[in-house]
């Protein structure tokens, strides 16, 4: 089973019906069918929440949270995973990555998974992790 990490960029594109939404929807269908495992760091979940709250409202952010909960995506906590947090901190210290993006990259590295994103900021780690580029 292929394992993929979704960056917040991918889910925001899906929810806002941007050009990459169709590719993300295909991944979600594969996860539902059991052929792919999709992961999302809780830090990136929080990024989706706060972006929605800033742009729309807290009510809209809560709705988006419910929608994510209904998808076949495993939310990955960071509270007890110092290996994951350490890798994110290394990426943040050595690359030009936002902190939340560093968690998505670290999760992909630690789980040996492909990161699915369209955020060009991840070019910083392209040689270190597998990236599935969305357009």
Task: Please report, for each region that a protein language model flagged, where it lies by residue.
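Active-site neighborhoods of divalent-metal-dependent phosphate/nucleic-acid chemistry enzymes
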Residues: 74-116
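Acidic, PIN/NYN-like endoribonuclease modules and their adjacent C-terminal/linker elements
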Residues: 1-3, 71-74, 105-135
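A generic structural signal for short hydrophobic patches within well-formed alpha-helices
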Residues: 11-12, 45, 122-123
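Histidine- and aromatic-rich ligand-binding microenvironments
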Residues: 6-7, 40-41, 96-98, 119, ...
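Extended, non-globular alpha-helical segments
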Residues: 63-71, 76
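Hydrophobic helix-cap positions at the C-terminus of alpha-helices
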Residues: 27-31, 68, 91, 107, ...
């Amino acid at each position: 089973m292929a394992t993929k990490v979704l960056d917040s960029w991918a889910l925001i594109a899906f929810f806002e019906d941007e050009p990459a939404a169709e590719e993300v929807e295909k991944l979600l269908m594969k996860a539902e069918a059991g052929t792919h495992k999709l992961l999302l760091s809780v830090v990136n979940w929080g990024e989706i929440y706060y972006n929605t709250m800033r742009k729309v409202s807290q009510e809209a952010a809560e709705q988006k949270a419910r929608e994510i909960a209904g998808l076949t995506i495993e939310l990955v906590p960071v509270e007890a995973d110092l290996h994951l947090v350490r890798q994110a901190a290394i990426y943040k210290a050595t690359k030009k990555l936002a902190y939340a993006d560093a968690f998505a990259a670290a999760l992909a590295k630690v789980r040996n998974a492909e990161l699915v994103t369209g955020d060009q900021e991840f070019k910083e780690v392209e040689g270190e992790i597998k990236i599935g580029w969305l357009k």
